[in-house]
Amino acid sequence: MSIEAIGEFQRGGHLLNANGFQNAGLGIWQPCFTAQRALRAAAAGDASALAGVNAGDRARCAIVAAQRDYSYWVESSDFFKLRSLSVSYDVPKRFTRGARNTTVSFAGRNLFVNTKYSGSDPEVADQRTSTFSRRDYYNFPPYRTFLFSVRTGF
C-alpha cells in the first residue's frame, strides 16, 4: 500500500468578501437577518427595535451600501488545504486469478480546507481585479474531484 498527500498553506493574506458585502445589502446574508429586521423596524419608526443591535452589526449589515463599512468585509485568507490524496493497494495474487499484478487506486483533489474565511474559498479572486488586490465576488471555488482506477498486468 502506498499513500501520497500534498498539503498547502497560506498565511498573512487578506481578501475582500464582496459576496458578503453585496448579500448583506440585498438582505440575503443569514448573519444579518436579525440586525436588518431591527434596522427596518427602526426606519419605520420603532426605535426600540435597535436595543439588541450593536454598532458593529449596524456597520456590517446596513441596507444602504454607503452606510456599510467595507473594512469589516476584508478578512484573513489564511488557510490549510489538502490539495491531493492518493492511496494505492497492490491486490494479493490469490485474489486475482490469471493476472500478473493488480493495483487498485483512489485519488482525490481539493478534499479539505481549514480556514476562518467566511466566503466560499480563500483563494478565489474576481477576474476584474488586479494582481495587487483580490476580492471574492460570486466566484466558484475549486472543484472537489475523485478518481478510482484498477490497473492489471497479464
What is the predicted function of each stretch?
Residues A5, V104-F106, V150:
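Membrane-embedded beta-strand positions of outer-membrane beta-barrel proteins
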Residues M1, L82-V87, R144-F148:
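Hydrophobic, lipid-facing positions within transmembrane beta-strands of outer-membrane proteins
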Residues I6, S88-P92, R151-G153:
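Transmembrane beta-barrel domains of outer membrane proteins
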Residues P31, A38-L50, A65-Q67, N114-F154:
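C-terminal beta-signal and terminal closure region of outer-membrane beta-barrel proteins
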